Structure formats: structure tokens, C-alpha cells
Amino acid sequence: MSKKAVIAGAGPAGLACATYLAGAGWSVDVFSNEENTESCLAEASIVKNYPGFPNGIEGVELLGLFVEQAQNAGVAIHPEGISSVHSDDKYIIDTNGAMHSYDEYVEAVGCRRREYRCDGLELIPVHYCAICDGGLYGKEDVVVVIGGGDTAISSALYLSNLVKMVVMVVRKPNCRFTNKKAFDELCSKRNVVIEYETQLHHVSSNGKGNPVLHLMHKNQCSDEMIVGAKGLFVCIGCESNVVEHVGNGRIWRCGDCSNDKKQVAIAVGDGARVALDIIGA
């Protein structure tokens, strides 16, 4: 009888790990739901730095190829999450009341978006995915993007093609990015304004139903007001998801929940590494 492995998370790391294990003769189940293990890769408009795609590829398409390859290898993917993990000699997995037993458990649950908090935020629509919600806005609208990393840059770029103006609010004195070409393209956009060393302090109303965003610049006593912004896109990083674990069994982890690089290529390699470690254990 083949050994059985269960993987929490159907992103690049989890699917790479599953594909390698299945190729080695393991029986592999992958559990994933939208709340805590759905891959952020599906939200990427274009991935230009993953090897094998010289012209880039949409995130959702790349993820679909990962899924197809895993399923072709014999991996079973289930659209439900794991509630808890109990481990002694075996790993007992609880999926909404149904119990399953496995020889090994891999956590590839990715991360969840970090929320932004300030007074009055309920006065303006807040979004955490430009690809998902950017289409809600048009050429007459102004939107604000909070953040200064790769996700904020790609989100601002995407939105700049949809709306009248994008105001990017960056807390630090510069942006931090891995794709200089994307950042240079963003800087060349005439409808993008980048406010460095600035934070959104609070949101108020102008009395006519329109939100007013109050930005505070470093070392300045007065705030700058943005009147008429229609939406706010928050891109300030993410936090690792966790699954409740009871027992002394080892937990294998791979992907974004175990490193801070947040790169598809690293996640895939990490998943492959964990699979090889399991096979050789």
C-alpha cells in the first residue's frame, strides 16, 4: 500500500510538493479553500519572472497549469479547508467534521493580506485585490493605493490603465521592489502620483457623501487632503496563515507561510525540496 500525504494549500508550493510526491508513488490529497489556502497567484495580472514564459503569463493561467500537472500526476484536489490537525503515529485531519488519516502532513497555506486600520475607513470602499475589483472604477475616477512593494506597484500599474488618476501612498522614503522595469514603467505614468514618507491618517466626509482622505507626511504638522477618491486599495503585505495543530508530529512547511520572499519560483522550489525531504525521510 502506498504512503499517504495531505497538503494544506493549493498554491505553487503545495502543488509542486504534491506533484513530486505523487510522482514518487505517494497517494496525495490537497485541501484548499478561499478563506485560508487559496493562492494569491491567481490575483497576479501578469507574471514576467517565472522561467519558461519569456513573454510572461497571467497568474491565474499559471496556477491552472500547476493544477493540471498535479492532477495528471494523480493528485486529488479538494475545495475545502482543514480545520485542525492531530498527530501521534498518524496525522488525523479534520475537514469540516470529516476525519482522514495520513502518514505525512504538509502546510503550504500561504498568507493572508494584512489589513489597514484608521479612523473613518468605513466611509470609502476598501479593496485588497486590484485585479478582482479594479473594474469597478472608470476613467473619471481617482483611486488610492497604500503600499510600496511589488504588489502595490503592480496594482497601481494595473489601475492606471483603468482610472483617471492613481495616488500611491508609501510609508517609507522609497519603494521596495524586485522588478525595476515595472517600477520604471509606473514612474513614467502621467496619471500616477507617488507620495513618499506618507500615511493615510484618517478618512472624513465632505458633507456631500464624498470621502476625504487625510494624508500625513513625515515631519509635517498639517495634513494633505484628497477629495473625491472613489476607492482605496491596500497592498501592505501579508501574514502567514496557521492551522490548529495538536500533538508531537512534525509539520513540513513550504511556500509563503515559511519564507518572506513571496516569489512563485521560490515557492515551487520550496515545495519540491519538502517533497524530496519527505521521500528521503
Where are these regions (language model features)?
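Residues within well-ordered alpha helices
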Residues: 20, 69, 105, 185-186, ...
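Predominantly flavin-linked oxidoreductase catalytic cores and closely associated redox partners
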Residues: 87, 91, 99-196, 203-205
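Rossmann-like dinucleotide/flavin-binding elements
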Residues: 2-33, 129-176, 222-223, 239-281
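Mid-to-C-terminal Rossmann-like scaffold of FAD/NAD(P)H-dependent oxidoreductases
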Residues: 2, 180-184, 201-202, 211, ...
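N-terminal Rossmann-like dinucleotide/flavin-binding domain of flavoprotein oxidoreductases
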Residues: 39-99, 175-199, 208-211
